[in-house]
Amino acid sequence: MVTVAELQALRQARLDLLTGKRVVSVQKDGRRIEYTAASLDELNRAINDAESVLGTTRCRRRPLGVRL
């Protein structure tokens, strides 16, 4: 069972990834490689799953139609 705290941690991880705070760099033999510790698609999928379990999904409302 997913907790609200775990959902918040997933959202923070996504924010960190998007803002570049989760970039890992390795330097060896004069070569430098940078990569992210998690993929954005995996984080979004995990967040959607957690929201579904907790019942906190954000349902979009239909646009209101205008009748004249």
UniProtKB/Swiss-Prot annotation:
Cell location: Virion
GO CC annotations, alphabetized: virion component
GO BP: viral life cycle
SUPFAM superfamilies: Head-to-tail joining protein W, gpW (SSF64210)
Keywords: Late protein, Viral capsid assembly, Viral release from host cell, Virion
Tree of life domain: Viruses
A Pfam family hit: gpW
Main location: virion
Keyword Cytoplasm: no
Family: Belongs to the lambda phage gpW family.
Record's function text: Plays a role in morphogenesis of the virion head after genome packaging. Presumably interacts with the portal vertex to stabilize the packaged DNA within the head after packaging. Probably binds to the head-tail connector protein gp8.
Record's subunit section: Monomer in solution, assembles into hexamers on the prohead. May bind gp8 and portal protein (Potential).
Protein name listed in UniProt: Head completion protein gp3
Source organism of the structure: Enterobacteria phage P21 (Bacteriophage 21)
